[in-house]
């Protein structure tokens, strides 16, 4: 874990004596008295940090040293700030000492929060910080607001209950001040008039928009300049925490001035006529509040409602600013980020005050119309879709175009964007109930959604684990099963789709991917287009699936395809867990046929095929156990599968479970429609397969069948014979011959001696049972009350009652 040298230093730090430590403290205090930063001072601070951090318990430093280290937090040397902050984090704060918030910087702010012993210490610290926001220059040194506000936000994130009604009112007013009334001039502007330029040319320049024009409105995060004032930085900080504030802290207050929705609608509409008559902040001591007049309507609003109104205006201005063409590419990305945040904040505001919906929707609708043709704004349009989902019904707007864009175009064209994939799937997961109510058609787009999984399986698997159950419906169950089984093919097709647009069409004599040539070939275009479909409903699967698998044979080793194949079994289990809750017996019978058919129609990936067969085996057993009548309903297909000897070698796991299901549930006790003729037909099919595999060697390239297959066939024959006694001589004769054959030595169909012993033992057990048909039927086909006993529930059959009766009889005189 540590090198030998590091372990030695840690050991020395832990074993240092108190006397030596006190001398070290005194020497360090003397070093801190010098103004210059020496190497000895830096080494001593490093050593002090090692001593403090290597011990289990925190130490208390001498007060003089503690004060010197605290003073270093405001040192011009960044290195000293970092070292002093690290040392102080490892110490206990002096008892009873007030927190120093006069000269906050990033290191000092982090230290204040880290030295809070528990949540109980946070309310006092929060109150002290909030009080510092009210300090005026005339009252003394003003702490740095740029570090105070983020620290307050961090405390409230950990402990929202720190906030009192008075604190909330103050912060609401301050946020209004910072958001709406930051200065509109920039600092640091250089004069362009030379030495003889007049005072007018040296006046502070106004802030500018991203397109370079002079800003004619209030300052926002999208305004630019050569430098920014503190209140402009506070504007940026306030906007960055605004959504969290609205979601978390607005519910704390008990606002007595809240009016009903109709009154708030009337008040809010009064603000939409003009922004020139805006009220100014009412924070006590604010210069702005002393020189500005408030409108009559704004006086009716509480601080909470005023913040809501100013937030609305701020977001509206941001959306307008994003119409401008930015001069820098980085500013274009900033516009997108601000659009996302602005729309999310408007969504929060409308959820809090529904009357704002009618003022907000025209702008949101115009924003969607402007951005919907440019898919580079896809991540911006997702919050717009969220707004439509949350408020579209109230505003009575048609959302069909929004859902068509989001569900159809985004996954089809941007499946390889990992950030959009995360945002898109998160949008679906968080809004499942709302989408099922407002846009139930979203389940039709599951072939499109699965493109995210096919492209980036490990990153989004967890999302689909949550999302898949909502996509399983009676109408889509069969097609969804086929689509899940074709996930590796879809992954390969998406790779080919991207390569076909980037790689040139090769010359006839050059070497290229056969699958890429097939993708470009019009003959096979329909196969790939089916996989790339955006909506369900065009068919459950395709007829030439084996041809598609041959075309994609080389893709079986592509890393992306291999990763995708590993996720399919997980999702299939989730699929079947859901489908049994929504499907009727007719649909479940169809799914059994699909499993039998698709067990032989999978992309040639040995590990993948083995895992899918294991899933099919498990789920087939489960479906038949839930609905035994399915075995009779699908008896012809099951018998056809079980009667094909090749399935023993290629689909061993599925075959074994099909045979077991036939032997277990093909019985009159499970379904009254089960006739002797059906039992005999099944017996003859299984008998022929068992005779064939035990009388000859496996086909070339195949291994000997597992003993589990043979013993399952033998048990199934014995079960069927116990239900039709005319068949007992036939199975008894076969079991006797099998025992005699194995006595002659090794056999070609079983290469392991232990396996052979297990097979013979099972045969002898079955043969002994069949000698007494009544016992065989009771053991091999027990009645329902034996399979599902209720003795622990039936007091008349309870064992304690019987023991009590026997005890009474034996002890009676």
Map each language-model feature to its residues:
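Extended, charge-rich alpha-helical scaffold/interaction domains
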Residues: 1-813
């Amino acid at each position: 874990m540590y090198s030998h040298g590091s372990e030695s230093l840690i050991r020395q730090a832990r074993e240092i004596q108190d006397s030596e430590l006190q001398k070290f403290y005194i020497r360090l205090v003397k070093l801190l008295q010098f103004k210059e930063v020496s190497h000895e001072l830096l080494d001593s601070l490093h050593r002090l940090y090692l001593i403090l951090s290597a011990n289990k318990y925190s130490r208390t430093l001498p007060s003089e040293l503690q004060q010197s280290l605290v003073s270093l937090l405001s040192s011009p040397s960044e290195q000293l700030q970092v070292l002093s902050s690290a040392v102080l984090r490892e110490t206990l704060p002096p008892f009873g000492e007030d927190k120093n918030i006069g000269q906050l910087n990033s290191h000092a702010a982090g230290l204040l929060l880290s030295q809070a012993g528990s949540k109980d210490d946070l309310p006092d610290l929060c109150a002290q910080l909030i009080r510092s926001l009210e300090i005026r220059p005339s009252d003394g040194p003003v702490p740095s607001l740029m570090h105070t506000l983020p620290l307050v936000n961090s405390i409230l994130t950990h402990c929202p209950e720190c906030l009192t009604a008075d604190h909330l009112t103050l912060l609401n007013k301050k946020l209004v001040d910072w958001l709406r009334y930051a200065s509109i001039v920039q600092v640091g502007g250089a004069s362009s008039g030379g030495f003889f330029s007049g005072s007018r040319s040296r006046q502070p320049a106004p802030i500018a928009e991203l397109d370079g024009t002079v800003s004619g409105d209030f300052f926002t995060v999208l305004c630019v300049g050569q430098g920014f004032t503190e209140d402009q930085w506070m504007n940026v900080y306030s906007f960055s925490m605004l959504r969290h504030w609205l979601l978390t802290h607005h519910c704390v207050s008990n606002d007595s001035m809240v009016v009903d929705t109709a009154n708030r609608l009337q008040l809010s509409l009064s603000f939409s006529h003009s922004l020139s008559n805006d009220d100014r902040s009412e924070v006590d001591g604010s210069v702005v509040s002393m020189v500005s007049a408030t409108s009559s309507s704004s006086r009716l609003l509480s601080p909470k409602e005023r913040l809501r109104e100013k937030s609305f205006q701020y977001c509206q201005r941001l959306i307008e600013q994003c119409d401008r063409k930015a001069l820098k590419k980085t500013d274009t990305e900033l516009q997108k980020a601000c659009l996302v945040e602005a729309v999310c904040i408007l969504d929060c505001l409308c959820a809090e005050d529904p009357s704002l919906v009618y003022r907000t929707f025209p702008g949101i609708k115009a924003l969607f119309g402007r951005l919907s043709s440019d898919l580079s704004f896809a991540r911006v349009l997702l919050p717009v879709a969220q707004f439509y989902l949350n408020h579209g019904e109230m505003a009575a707007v048609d959302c069909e175009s929004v859902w068509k864009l989001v569900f159809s175009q985004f996954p089809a064209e941007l499946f390889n964007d990992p950030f959009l994939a995360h945002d898109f799937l998160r949008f679906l997961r968080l809004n499942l109930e709302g989408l099922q109510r407002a846009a139930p058609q979203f389940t039709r787009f599951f072939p499109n959604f699965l493109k995210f999984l096919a492209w980036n399986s490990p990153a989004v698997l967890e999302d689909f684990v949550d999302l898949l159950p909502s996509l399983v419906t009676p109408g889509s169950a069969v097609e969804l099963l086929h689509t899940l089984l074709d996930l590796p093919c879809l992954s390969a097709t998406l790779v080919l789709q991207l390569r076909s647009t980037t790689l040139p069409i090769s010359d006839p004599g050059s070497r290229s991917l056969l699958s890429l040539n097939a993708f470009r070939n019009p003959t096979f275009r329909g196969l790939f287009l089916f996989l790339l479909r955006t909506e369900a409903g065009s068919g459950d699967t395709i007829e030439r699936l084996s041809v598609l698998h041959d075309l994609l044979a080389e893709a079986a080793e592509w890393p992306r395809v291999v990763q995708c194949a590993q996720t399919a079994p997980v999702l299939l289990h989730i699929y079947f867990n859901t489908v049994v809750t929504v499907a009727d017996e007719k649909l479940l019978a169809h799914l059994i046929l699909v499993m039998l058919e698709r067990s032989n129609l999978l992309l040639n990936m040995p590990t993948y095929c083995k895992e899918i067969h294991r899933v099919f085996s498990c789920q087939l057993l489960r479906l038949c156990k839930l609905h035994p009548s399915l075995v009779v309903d699908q008896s012809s297909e099951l018998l056809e599968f079980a009667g094909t000897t090749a399935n023993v070698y290629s689909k061993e796991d599925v075959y074994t479970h099909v045979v077991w299901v036939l032997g277990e549930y093909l019985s009159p006790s499970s379904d009254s429609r089960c006739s002797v003729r059906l039992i005999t037909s099944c017996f003859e099919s299984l008998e022929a397969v068992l005779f064939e595999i035990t009388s000859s060697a496996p086909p070339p390239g195949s291994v000997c069948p597992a003993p589990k297959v043979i013993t399952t066939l033998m048990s199934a024959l014995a079960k069927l014979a116990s239900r039709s006694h005319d068949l007992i001589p036939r199975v008894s004769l076969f079991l006797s011959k099998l025992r005699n054959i194995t006595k002659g030595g090794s056999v070609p169909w079983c290469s392991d001696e232990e396996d052979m012993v297990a097979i013979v033992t099972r045969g002898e057990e079955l043969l002994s049972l069949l000698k007494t048909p009544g016992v065989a039927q009771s053991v091999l086909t027990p009645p329902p009350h034996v399979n599902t006993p209720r003795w622990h529930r039936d007091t008349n059959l309870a064992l304690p009652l019987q023991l009590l009766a026997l005890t009474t009889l034996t002890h009676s005189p």
